Structure formats: C-alpha cells, structure tokens
Amino acid sequence: MTTQSLKAEAVALEADVMALDAEAKALNDKLESLDLAGRLALIAGLEGRAVFTTSLGIEDQVITAAIGSNRLDIEVATLKTGRLFNETVALIDQTEETYDILIKRYYPEKADIDAYVAQYGMNGFYESVEARHACCGVRKLKPLARALDGASYWITGLRRGQSGNRATTPFAEADVERGLIKINPLADWGIETIQAHVAAEGIPVNPLHSRGYPSIGCEPCTRAIKPGEPERAGRWWWENDEKRECGLHVPEAASSIIPNASNAA
C-alpha cells in the first residue's frame, strides 16, 4: 500500500470515528429525558442491529424484563463462560420462560480454553493480573466479539453507582474499537431504585443478591461483600487495583494476552 493510500485510509477512519462520536452524543442527549422503556424503544427503532448482553445481574434483569414485556426488537445474549454460578445458569432458563424471549448463549472455544490451561493452569487467574486478563479474554471477550458481530448498538447494564471508574457513565458512548455505540439505559439508576423496581414488577433475580453478592460474575472470581464495601468489591477481590475490570467495558492492555490455540503445547 502506498503512502498516499495509507493517508487516505487514515482520513477515512478519522471521519468514521467522528461520525460515530457525533451520533453517540446526539443519542445521549435524547436518552437523558426518557424513562427506561422509552430509552429502549428509541434504540429498538433505530436502523441497525441492537444487542443487549446480560450477565443476569439485578440491573440486567430490569432491562431484560423491559425488552420482553414491551416486545422490543432487541436481541438478548449472554456469555456462558463455563465458570458461572449454578444460580446464574438456572436464572437464564427462568427468565426466558417468564418473558417468552430467547437469550442467546455464547460460549468460549474449547481450543482457547485448552490453550489457556496449558499456559496458566485451570485457576491461573489467581496467580497474576496477566493470567486473569487472559482468562477473561478467552471466556468473555472473544465470545462477546461474536455476539456483537454486525451490531450497531450494544446495550449494557452499566450504572454510575457500581464503582468509581463507572461514575461518569453516559447513556450513549462511541465504542470506537468495536465500531458501534454502547447504550447504558440504567446509567442514572441507583441500586435502591433498581431494587424497588424489581420488587414492584416481580422481576426474577439471582438469589445470590440476597446473600451479599450485589455484583455477580464467574464463581471463582466473585465473593460476597462486607457491609459498607462498594458494590463491585467482591469481583477479583485478591487484586489491589481499584479499577478491576474484565475488559468488556474498560479496555485493558493485558486483555490482549489471550493464549493462541495454535501454540498450545
């Protein structure tokens, strides 16, 4: 490729990024004044595929209930990592039955898991941040990429009150890496509002929430929190970094350290 071609490609890419960012900002302004049902209906009515990825947490259940109850044209997907709590797995079927919807499951590739285990061991994520990020990459990031392939809008259950590094979460933001717009319809909902809504609407939730698990991920990487701790304090609790994330919502350099199945011994 010539230098001129590279420059033209860079200019085109920059234009795409600017357009995505402008659309996200315009959407953010529109979503702010709407209620949850209105926010989701607005996204469902846009041109392009909208995908909601649920971890079956309490806020995700609120969104799933709104999608199902209003029969919105939004795909619902979940990442079956292979290390989920039994309670979480059971809730998938219960939620499908309750709202007569399909929750599409996305699984990690066996070859990727084998490569990870060969390099780090089954529970190597306890040994280093690098190994933990690699596990999240294999079990979450790669399946997520398949779930979002071809999507224009990615709906999440992110809330500003979940952790310090989510405190400025907007209703809509450009995800340049994935080439789509991320929608956070519950960004301004507090946990008390979530709990009251769940109780009023009879929304099924994970029983682990009542046992001290406000944030629930994979079983080996989640513990109950102590009184007064932040909502996500039980996630990867053995790590010291306050910005503990799996890489789904906050890109992390080490999340690119995903074992290559072709190099597995």
Curated annotation (Swiss-Prot):
Compartments (UniProt record): Cytoplasm
HAMAP family noted in UniProt: CysH
Designated name of the protein: Adenosine 5'-phosphosulfate reductase
Biological source species: Rhizobium meliloti (strain 1021)
Family: Belongs to the PAPS reductase family. CysH subfamily.
Entries under CDD domains matching the protein: PAPS_reductase
Metal-binding recorded as keyword: yes
UniProt xrefs under InterPro entries: APS_reductase (IPR011798), PAPS/APS_Rdtase (IPR004511), PAPS_reduct_dom (IPR002500), Rossmann-like_a/b/a_fold (IPR014729)
EC number(s) on file: 1.8.4.10
Pathway annotation: Sulfur metabolism; hydrogen sulfide biosynthesis; sulfite from sulfate
Function noted in UniProt: Catalyzes the formation of sulfite from adenosine 5'-phosphosulfate (APS) using thioredoxin as an electron donor.
Catalytic residues, chain numbering: 246 (nucleophile)
Note describing how the cofactor binds: Binds 1 [4Fe-4S] cluster per subunit.
UniProt xrefs under Pfam families: PAPS_reduct
GO process terms (BP): cysteine biosynthetic process; hydrogen sulfide biosynthetic process; sulfate assimilation, phosphoadenylyl sulfate reduction by phosphoadenylyl-sulfate reductase (thioredoxin)
Catalytic activity: [thioredoxin]-disulfide + sulfite + AMP + 2 H(+) = adenosine 5'-phosphosulfate + [thioredoxin]-dithiol
SUPFAM superfamilies per the UniProt record, alphabetical: Adenine nucleotide alpha hydrolases-like (SSF52402)
Residue positions binding [4Fe-4S] cluster: 135-136, 218, 221
One GO cellular component term noted in the UniProt record for this chain: cytoplasm
GO molecular function, one term: adenylyl-sulfate reductase (thioredoxin) activity
Keywords: Cytoplasm, Iron, Iron-sulfur, Metal-binding, Oxidoreductase
Listed cofactors: [4Fe-4S] cluster
Protein's gene: cysH
